[in-house]
């Protein structure tokens, strides 16, 4: 019975997602979960007293290690897995849908979700363009698209031909830097950046993900681009061919652009919509439900009308335009949100442009280009009563949230897979023990004799192995798109900054009423609440491992 109350409390903490802070320190020596200590009783969470002078410090440290190991094993119930719902909507800001009167949407990867089968087609077409039009070596044709290589949100240092993952504080995550298809050793990465992992602000990507020498790959279409870039670099390095990094980067990005400009991607999708377009019936259900509840809808996309029309007919039906109050195609986002000079032009049923001046935006009509300032003037849709959904954090959401006060929703298809991984027992146990071990390392570093340092080095090695295990569960090369080992990624930082809500697909809206209020959970700062497993039982003591931390005052 001694540990039953404590274990029950810890289980409740875990099942509640770790919300809430530590118990207030008590002057009583008893453990709140275990009752008064009896003769010889030992709460598994209560720290052993500091060893006496001359005691075997190594044995003391390993005893602490085993205590923590048992605690983690006992307090992590099976039901803690599968807590997160992949179909849920997650909130960065509090937002009530009852306040939203107008819903706006991007098209690609928002209204229309595409199958991963599209990526090999883009890769192969751009690879062949490089060979046939840019005269790159024929040997590059041996490379095929590898869907397991890259993840979204990576940065590419053009001058160094380095593809890497950067955290929210501009630090390269060591072990995630690749030149071509080969990992770059950590010490070489540090040397490349002047003895540090930090990327200075002036080199980093700017507001729209582009910097003077470093680009961030933010949209889903960039996955085949990163793969092709890495394959071409790999070929040149493997064959000892000299190349200019800037020219190579530009040629690859131009080849990828040609796939879009020439309409190849549009042709593939139009020829087999059943293969490439996913969840079309769910898109129809979302739009119909919103209209049935009196919401106004609009569409702003960079795609051409003929392509959008065929896709919407496939998903929604021939009368799809009657669902939308305004439809804008070839909008040229993100310039649409900042450039006041481009006027709207009306398209007729055949896709021909009209020359008359646009003084109002009519339901059922199609408009091309334009700009947000005229859009706001003509519709009077302003501020928090507008909620716009898109997949590109920069091109779709950044300006709308920061400059115009719209509410924004990010569509992140990768979220579904990542949540399923987080829900696995392997991930949960690995991460929890990793956090507990980190806490032990932090507290036990006060012991600096030779034997203790050897124990701590063993723990450090185990911690690094655990980090690599959890990273590889998501992607062997780069890990999760949302986290480095312990910090949010640069991608996550932008996701939180530019979106009120984020979800795996638009269909997640079907799980909530149209007047639902989303409440973000209070995220504790480092100084506010010690919530990890190694500190769960701080109610048992005034200060965790007080004897070991006596040097801190």
Swiss-Prot record:
Gene Ontology MF terms: 5'-nucleotidase activity; metal ion binding
Residues annotated as catalytic: 106, 108
Domain of life: Eukaryota
The EC number(s) this enzyme carries: 3.1.3.-
Expression sites (tissue/organ): Expressed in eye iridocorneal angle.
Function according to Swiss-Prot or TrEMBL: Promotes dephosphorylation of tyrosine 3-monooxygenase TH which decreases TH catalytic activity and leads to reduced synthesis of catecholamines including dopamine, noradrenaline and adrenaline. The exact mechanism of activity is unknown but may act as a phosphatase or promote the activity of phosphatases or may inhibit phosphorylation by acting as a barrier to interfere with protein kinase access.
This protein's name: 5'-nucleotidase domain-containing protein 2
GO cellular component, as recorded: cytoplasm
Subunit note: Interacts with tyrosine 3-monooxygenase TH; the interaction results in reduced phosphorylation and decreased catalytic activity of TH.
Gene: Nt5dc2
Subcellular location: Cytoplasm
Region of interest (Disordered), residue spans: 26-51
InterPro entries the UniProt entry points to: HAD-like_sf (IPR036412), HAD-SF_hydro_IG_5-nucl (IPR008380), HAD_sf (IPR023214), Pur_nucleotidase (IPR016695)
Keywords recorded for this protein, A-Z: Cytoplasm, Hydrolase, Magnesium, Metal-binding
Residues that coordinate or bind Mg(2+): 106, 108, 391
Organism of provenance: Rattus norvegicus (Rat)
